[in-house]
Amino acid sequence: MTEPANNHPSPPPQNWLFKWWNSLNAITRLLVLVLGAPLMVLNARALSSIFGYFESLFVISLIASVIAFLLNYPVAWLEKQGAKRFVAASFVFLTALIIFTALGVTLIPLALSQAQQLVARLPDWLDSGQKQLVLLDQKAEILGWPVNFDGLIPQINSRLAAELQNLAGSTLNLALSLTVFTVVRLLDVLLTIILTFYLLLHTDDVWQSIIGWLPERFQKPFSDTLRRSFQNYFLGQLVSATCMALGLISGFLLLKVPFGLLFGLTVGVMALIPFGGSVGIVLVTFLVALRDIGMALQLLAVALVIQQIVENGIAPRVLGSVTGLNPFWVLISLLTGARIGGLLGVIVAVPSAVMIKEALGAIRSMKPLVPAPDHNQDPLYFKNQEEVQPLPPRP
């Protein structure tokens, strides 16, 4: 018997959420949006209050998780070479602890010393910047350029003096905060170290206990998406920031830029955050321009060349695409993370946005079980059935 021909194109499968939304009329959709928006705001407010109450616990857990996540890659490589998990985790953890301790003992005191010297010399740099503006105004007047800095110089003078006072106060507060941190928050540091080592030993067990709360069909996609998002972002930013700091420190020292170590480390640390490297370069260029505009232009040229080499040459070759997000959404996620969680929110904002993007894409492409077609509601089916002639009976 010939099967009936179906001329209707099969509709693309839809997720149950989209099917439910399409089944609503316009008034119901409006009511859902009107009632859902306040609930989302209340939930966000409640989550913010909970986060504020358990902020210390969340910060310790998140920092330990990120460090353990990054250290897990050399541990996994050592396991593939035949080492046991405990031996590999202990070796990697102790090596990382020694490296961080060495950096903290050598580079951080030098950077803090240069920061104190910079604050002490800023008034002299401010006077030098004013003199350079006066000379620039005189040259513009000689050349006949329609530029007048007479009214601008006093405004810049007062504004920079106010910013200098704020910077000095911020430096003093930072020093006091670091002192209080070393005395009061020592327990948090110890807890972070212990939790990092524990997570490094039992990464798979802890992770399986977390994703075990999800439905079984969501566990592997969620795990792969989260690992890929955080891996690409944190490793990408870490490689870029390290290369940026090393390159800038070397370039600044060759140019004999004052406080080259401090400026290179500052830009490198700021490069851990998207767009932070560019902001750091502009800030350092402005500070050096107060002392010498010619040196500032050389510094800017070297910094831009190193930044382009790192961002467009080294990082893509090592890790490929880092986020896959449009720069606009990267900026929005950073602002949102800063508003919700401060510095901690900025750190996890971009990988969280990447994970949300991947999750939404997975939901849209999800193929639910499509029920069998109901031929009772298809008039073309009966028409095709009438056109089909039955075969004659066998003799």
Swiss-Prot record:
Domain of life: Bacteria
Main location: membrane
Any one of the GO BP annotations: transmembrane transport
The keyword rRNA processing appears for this protein: no
Membrane topology note: Multi-pass membrane protein
Family annotation (Pfam families): AI-2E_transport (PF01594)
InterPro entries: AI-2E-like
Keyword Cell membrane: yes
TM ranges: 24-44, 50-70, 91-111, 180-200, 245-265, 269-289, 295-315, 328-348
Subcellular localization(s) per the UniProt record: Cell membrane
Gene Ontology annotations for the cellular component aspect, listed alphabetically: plasma membrane
Keywords: Cell membrane, Membrane, Transmembrane, Transmembrane helix, Transport
Family: Belongs to the autoinducer-2 exporter (AI-2E) (TC 2.A.86) family.
Protein name: Putative transport protein sll0063
